[in-house]
Amino acid sequence: VLLQETWINQCAVERRAKYTIFFSSSDSNGTNRTEAGVAIMIKNTLLNKIIDIEPISDRLMVISLRGTVTYTFVNAYMYTSKNPEKNPDIYRQLKGIVHRHRGGGPVLIGGDFNADVQSTDAAGNRAVGAHTFDKKHESEIRDEGMISNREELLDFCISQGHIIANTWYHKTETPKITWKRPGTIPTHDKIRGHYAVK
């Protein structure tokens, strides 16, 4: 399970009866809580399958698991539309992660991308499926930051041959968005892999 906004000290590990949580944040002294933070929660029965854990920052974390092939899971947490200028660096890091791990097996990226992908984005590319969550009211106008986040997500997926998986499967409206603060635009969480989904 990939978690965002964990607000936990850097590189902490929390072990429970049935699962272990590995945290990553930007706090280097281990005493302060961060504004972001990502974590990956794993069943204890899978701990012996862990090949590597990379706590990169409070916005990125990677874990590789051994199976019949190596599965690499990346947890990404993009900045909101208030700070979209910080996202290109995260996307550069994501491209590097995909490049390093792609030959070993599936690379699955999930998290909170703070992006609003629309059905019109599906035209002309294979990254977006037919099951997007489109605006329902004119009052839900996208701001420039949200548009920038969307474009960066689409550019990344297209350039890397990834899909935005939750746009490829029919589901009710609620699972298409994960959170909507009153008066704001719905934000989507995406998972995508470099292999074709049939």
Regions found by a protein language model. Give the residues of each.
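A shared catalytic/ligand-binding motif for oxyanion handling
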Residues: 1-198
